[in-house]
Amino acid sequence: MGSGPLSGIKIVEFAGIGPGPFCASLLSDMGADIVRIDRKGAKGGSKYDIGSRGRRSVALDLKKPESVEACLKLIEKADILQEGFRPGVMERLGLGPDVCLKRNPKLVYGRMTGWGQTG
């Protein structure tokens, strides 16, 4: 965990492209403790991604129930969830806002897309 104004804030980031990883990098720079969920089997992974600096990473197959449960256990202890998938993806994976907020009512569920949830 770093120092800074966000020290002590726990964030679960679902790996994506563009603004999501950049946002998480800035939050990490300000001291947030970030765990990035990478797709299992993806080439390279966050180890080689300069945009994933300052955070830990775990690779999971989110189509497997045990991986979804592992994510939910992380989410139970998180302050913020950040995702940037296409609309409906998190819901299909069983990780939509309704499910996550039942596990952690204080969670801030952040979505970041280029065209919103209906575009």
Regions from the PLM with identified roles:
Residues 1-119:
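N-terminal helix-loop segment corresponding to the beta1-alpha1 unit
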